[in-house]
Amino acid sequence: MAAQTQRAVLAGGCFWGMEDLIRRLPGVTATRVGYTGGDVPNATYRNHGTHAEAIEILFDPARTDFRAILEFFFQIHDPSTKNRQGNDIGLSYRSAIYYVDDEQKRIAEDTIADVDASGLWPGKVVTEVEPVGPFWEAEPEHQDYLERYPDGYTCHFPRPGWRLPARAEG
């Protein structure tokens, strides 16, 4: 019997670039962008209060896992800048992991510790780790944005030399 699809919710700056790169990962079966982690019900682009721009990811655990997705997440955005990615500044652009269960929380905390220990970023990770709450899907014009506008704005890029070292087992 095949494993069920699992869900991850991440925020790391403008959701266009995050979605464009993460949706291409092997094992990712669906993505959608939206708003979460804030105070406004039925959030929209024009009124999202303290929500972060985020991406909801569905993935096949037989083909990838939460840790692999997080390692890529930490490669494509700068988790050491608070409320900022590139030219995008503000609470909407914070780095956050919204965990769906205790296992995701543990993996998130372990991965952050490994990123900090690696020295791959100039500062300590400021990524928030919070339980997932309501996810308000963004308007249709924001879904798959860079697929429709390949030369559109992004501040997310794969860093080929960025590889998180394997965790030393103690």
Curated annotation (Swiss-Prot):
The keyword Metal-binding does not apply. The active site is at C14. GO terms for molecular function: L-methionine:thioredoxin-disulfide S-oxidoreductase activity; peptide-methionine (S)-S-oxide reductase activity. Its EC number is 1.8.4.11. InterPro entries: Met_Sox_Rdtase_MsrA_dom, Met_Sox_Rdtase_MsrA_sf. Disulfide bonds: none annotated. One of its GO terms (biological process) is protein modification process. The keyword Magnesium does not apply. It catalyses: L-methionyl-[protein] + [thioredoxin]-disulfide + H2O = L-methionyl-(S)-S-oxide-[protein] + [thioredoxin]-dithiol; [thioredoxin]-disulfide + L-methionine + H2O = L-methionine (S)-S-oxide + [thioredoxin]-dithiol. It comes from the Bacteria. Keywords: Oxidoreductase. Belongs to the MsrA Met sulfoxide reductase family. Has an important function as a repair enzyme for proteins that have been inactivated by oxidation. Catalyzes the reversible oxidation-reduction of methionine sulfoxide in proteins to methionine. This is Peptide methionine sulfoxide reductase MsrA. It comes from Streptomyces avermitilis (strain ATCC 31267 / DSM 46492 / JCM 5070 / NBRC 14893 / NCIMB 12804 / NRRL 8165 / MA-4680).
